[in-house]
Amino acid sequence: MSLAQFLAEYEPHVHITAFVLGSARLSVFFMTAPFFGNAVAGMVVRSAVVLALYLIVHPMVLASVAPLMPAEGGGWVLLVALLLKEIFLGFVLGWLAGLAFWAVESAGLFIDNQRGASQASLSDPLSGDQSSPTGAFMLQSTCYAFFASGAFAAMLGLIYSTYECWPVGELLPSALFTKPGAALFFGERMAGLAALTVLISAPIVLACLFADAALGLVNRFAPQLNVYVISMPVKCGVASFLLLFYFAVLMTDAAERFAAFGIDLATFRAFIP
């Protein structure tokens, strides 16, 4: 079938409705996920990317939405409900995909707080929000590893699979909002985010704590030495030295953290039969 025949098979308003409903999931996903922040690409660039990625699934979305047309009377209520469902799914998918990135950024914030550089804040180029120097550096490095390693293509395949599991033309079952395990699932992901943040930052934070303990002993036996003045340079030096070796390990383990999105998505699918 040629492109002209495909476009002529349905009325223009059917194509437009399918595009609005189908692209909402991808649009909200990219707005929520931190690796495609507002400061990296503007609205025009993001819209072009979403359009290019959406066209792959447009025939599938069109086949799901076309039976709902023409929308007469209460039909528009159904379309609005479907749009809200797509926004909800896009937000959940973007939130699950961003957990690994937010954990790395929070770990960098913990490290800066422990080494005494918590007041050194800057605007993160990816998200546009305020962040610490180490947090912004670790987040950007993780994003570079995410795209360079091919993890983005794998994640995009998982996003495309959701259009088959949860068709655009169907509402979510009420079981998602009535099952107690659904709320527990999101709580566990938040707990996992906090645990991963502590785990990533633990080596550098512990080294800074040991440096504080050593400086405390120095202050005990040499009270005339102003330990407060030298504590921050010492801890910054220790943290920077350890980051030279720890950064390679952090980037090597990034693939495992990226793969967690597939595991979380499979768990979330169990709540929506």
Predicted regions and their residues:
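Hydrophobic alpha-helical segments and their helix-loop boundaries in membrane
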Residues: M1-P273
